[in-house]
Amino acid sequence: STEPIPVHISEETRRKHEESCRLYPWLNLSEHEYVIQMIPRHSIGIWGPTFAMILAIILVSVFMFCYPDIAKPIGLAQSMYPQVILICLMVIILFGIGLYIAIWVYMQNRFFLTNESVIQEIQISLFSKREQTVSLMNIEDSSYSQKGILQTLFNYGSIRLSTEGDETTYRFSYVADPKNQVAVLNNAVEAFKNGRPVTNDD
């Protein structure tokens, strides 16, 4: 049988690969693959749930501290105040944990551009996650869209990738500065298909 010919890996490529493995140890990178850019979601996507949860915590806190004043006019027992404090504190803690989980899940949705592929991590819930990997060679088209005043004002939008062959479409929403991200991606795809090194400077 014929042994596969080992591919020569330059010192620079090896260094970049090792650095990427150190920064993103959960990614399954080949021995000559490294991360060029990590694209997180724009924080605006979590502003609404965060505001709602903070408002709920404030309302529960106000009720807890004002219970004696509220209870007297409507005939509720003042002796219940210790139990009310305990229940309100438990509700506040639950709201806080829920907010933390929501932010964590949202921010775990990430988009990686390497010198060989695009990797999209999709965190659906606390215990549900999937990953999509597309070779740069298979990317036929990449584009971005910004719709509405908010997306234009805060400079975020969506990235869309379409692939050759199976014609699958990949989308990543709430991307900060999508125009620049797509420019970097298009340069990387062009360099890869033309056999040129894919670097951060492309």
Where would I find each of the regions flagged by the language model?
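N-terminal basic, Ser/Thr-rich segments that initiate or prime the first beta/alpha elements at protein or domain
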Residues: S1-D202
